[in-house]
Amino acid sequence: MSWQTYVDDHLMVDFEGQGQHLAAAAILGHDGSVWAQSPHFPKFKPEEITNIMKDFDEPGFLAPTGLFLAGIKYMVIQGEPGAVIRGKKGSGGITIKKTNQALIFGLYEEPVTPGQCNMVVEKIGDYLVDQGY
C-alpha cells in the first residue's frame, strides 16, 4: 500500500457517513520530508518540524510558545509525552502522532471534533508502529 493510500483512505475518512472529514492530513518523515499529504495540507517551514520533533524529545518544549505549522499558531493541549502532540486554534486543531520513522498529522475544523481527529491519527499511527514504521 502506498503512503498516499494511508492518507486518502485512512486519514481523510468520512466520519460516521456524515460527509465530515479532516481539513488536511499528511505523513512526514522525522526529517520533515513529505511521504504523502492531502491536497490542502499547509506548506510548513522546516524549523516548525524541527520544533515539533524537539517537543517529542523534550515534552513541554512547545507549551510556552505554542505549536506552529505553516505560520499558524496552535495552543498546545494535553497529549502523550513522546508520542502524541495535540493543539487547538479556535474551532479547529491539530493532532500529531510520532511513530518510529514518521509523523502523522491531522488537522480539523468544526463540525469534526478533537476526539474524531485524535482517533484516526492515533489509530493509523499505532498501526504503523506495529508494522515497524
Curated annotation (Swiss-Prot):
Keywords per UniProt: Actin-binding, Cytoplasm, Cytoskeleton
Q: Which Pfam families match?
A: Profilin
A molecular-function term among this protein's GO annotations: actin monomer binding
What name does UniProt use for this protein? Profilin-3
Instruction: Report the source organism.
Output: Nicotiana tabacum (Common tobacco)
Q: Give Gene Ontology CC terms.
A: cell cortex; cytoskeleton
Tell where it localizes.
Answer: Cytoplasm, Cytoskeleton
| Entry-linked InterPro entries | PFN (IPR048278), PFN_euk (IPR005455), PFN_sf (IPR036140), Profilin_CS (IPR027310)
Family annotation (SUPFAM superfamilies) = Profilin (actin-binding protein)
Function description: Binds to actin and affects the structure of the cytoskeleton. At high concentrations, profilin prevents the polymerization of actin, whereas it enhances it at low concentrations. By binding to PIP2, it inhibits the formation of IP3 and DG.
Q: How does it assemble?
A: Occurs in many kinds of cells as a complex with monomeric actin in a 1:1 ratio.
UniProt family annotation: Belongs to the profilin family.
